[in-house]
Swiss-Prot record:
Listed name of the protein: Cytochrome c biogenesis protein CcsA
Gene Ontology MF terms: heme binding
Subunit structure comment from the entry: May interact with Ccs1.
One Pfam match: Cytochrom_C_asm
Annotated source species: Oryza sativa subsp. indica
UniProt KW Transmembrane helix keyword: yes
PANTHER family linked: CYTOCHROME B_B6 PROTEIN-RELATED, HEME EXPORTER PROTEIN C
Record-level GO BP terms: cytochrome complex assembly
C-alpha cells in the first residue's frame, strides 16, 4: 500500500511539473525578454526526472522485478529515457537542441501512460513464466532506449524537411526592435541573436536564407548522431532478444509480428545510415528515410499491443471508452 501511494504521488507530481515546464519552455522560445525562465524549466525537468526515477525504483522494490512487464511501465520507462536524452547535451555543456523534441515527447508519452490507459494497467502484476528471466531488463530496456533515441532522431529529420521545404522562413518579427522569434525551434534563438548582433553593422541581404541553411545543417548533424546511437541500441536489443528467445522458446528467431516489425525498423534505419555514405543523399533525402522510421517505430511499439497477438502480446491492452 505504501509503495502504491508513493507511485501515485510521484507520477502525478512529475506529470504536473512537466506540463508547467513545457509551457515555460514555449514562452521562453517565443519571447526573449523572458529568457530568465529557462533556468526554471530546466530545474523542473530535473525534478521530474527524479520523480520518474523514484517511481521506477519504487515499482521495482514492490514487484521484485524490473518494471517493464506491461505497456504502462514501458511507457513510463520510455519517458524516463527521453529525460536522459534531454540531459545529455547539458552534461556536455552544449546547447540543448533536443529540448523542443524531448520535452513535448515526454509529456505526451507520460500523459498517455497516466491518463490514456485503464487503471488496471497501472497495477504491478506477477510476471508470466516466459518473462521471468535476467534478460528482461537487458532486452526490453535496450529496445525502449533505442525507441526513444530513434524517435528523437526521426523528429529532427522531420523538422529538417519542414524547414527545407518552407518557402518563407521568417525568423524574426519586424514589429519589434528587440526581435521576437516567430518560428520557435530547438533553442536556436540564442544562436540567432548572437549572429544577428555580430552582423548588425554589416550588409547581409541573404540573412534569412543563411540562417535557414545553418539550421538545416545543424539539424542534419544532430539527427545523424542521435540515430546512430539509437541504431546501435536497437541492434543490441535485438541480439539480446534473440538469445532470450532461444532460451525461452528454443529458437533465435520466429518471425513473430513484433520480431518482424523490429527487423523492418532496423532495416529502415540501416538504409538511412547507409545513405549517409553517399554525399548526394545527405540532408533532405536521408531525412525523408528517417522520417518514415518515425511511423515504423510506433507501429513496432504499439502494433502488437493493439492486436494482442504473437509471442510478444503480454503487454496488450484495451483503450478506455
Amino acid at each position: 500500500m505504501l509503495f502504491a501511494t508513493l507511485e501515485h504521488i510521484l507520477t502525478h507530481i512529475s506529470f504536473s511539473t512537466i506540463s508547467i515546464v513545457i509551457t515555460i519552455h514555449l514562452i521562453t522560445l517565443l519571447v526573449r525578454e523572458l529568457g530568465g525562465l529557462r533556468d526554471s524549466s530546466e530545474k523542473g525537468m530535473i525534478a521530474t526526472f527524479f520523480c520518474i526515477t523514484g517511481f521506477l525504483v519504487s515499482r521495482w522494490a514492490s514487484s521484485g522485478h524490473f518494471p517493464l512487464s506491461n505497456l504502462y511501465e514501458s511507457l513510463i520507462f520510455l519517458s524516463w529515457a527521453l529525460y536522459i536524452l534531454h540531459m545529455i547535451p547539458k552534461i556536455q555543456n552544449s546547447k540543448n537542441d533536443l529540448s523542443t523534441i524531448t520535452t513535448p515527447s515526454t509529456i505526451l508519452t507520460q500523459g498517455f501512460a497516466t491518463s490514456g490507459l485503464l487503471t488496471e494497467m497501472h497495477q504491478s502484476t506477477i510476471l508470466v513464466p516466459a518473462l521471468q528471466s535476467q534478460w528482461l531488463m537487458m532486452h526490453v530496456s535496450m529496445m525502449l532506449l533505442s525507441y526513444a533515441t530513434l524517435l528523437c532522431g526521426s523528429l529532427l529529420s522531420a523538422a529538417l524537411l519542414m524547414i527545407r521545404f518552407r518557402k518563407n522562413l521568417d525568423f524574426f518579427s519586424k514589429k519589434k526592435k528587440n526581435v521576437l522569434l516567430k518560428t520557435f525551434f530547438f533553442n536556436e534563438i540564442e544562436y540567432f541573436y548572437a549572429k544577428r548582433s555580430a552582423l548588425k553593422s554589416t550588409f547581409f541581404p541573404l540573412f534569412p536564407n543563411y540562417y535557414k541553411y545553418q539550421l538545416i545543417e545543424r539539424l542534419d548533424s544532430w539527427s545523424y548522431r542521435v540515430i546512430s546511437l539509437g541504431f546501435t541500441l536497437l541492434t543490441i536489443g535485438i541480439l539480446c532478444g534473440a538469445v532470450w528467445a532461444n532460451e525461452a522458446w528454443g529458437s533465435y528467431w520466429n518471425w513473430d509480428p513484433k520480431e518482424t516489425w523490429a527487423f523492418i525498423t532496423w532495416t529502415i534505419f540501416a538504409i538511412y545510415l547507409h545513405s549517409r555514405t553517399n554525399p548526394n543523399w545527405k540532408g533532405t533525402k536521408s531525412a525523408f528515410v528517417a522520417s518514415i522510421g518515425f511511423l515504423i517505430i510506433w507501429i513496432c511499439y504499439f502494433g502488437i499491443n493493439l492486436l494482442g497477438i504473437g509471442l510478444h502480446s503480454y503487454g496488450s491492452f484495451t483503450l478506455p471508452i
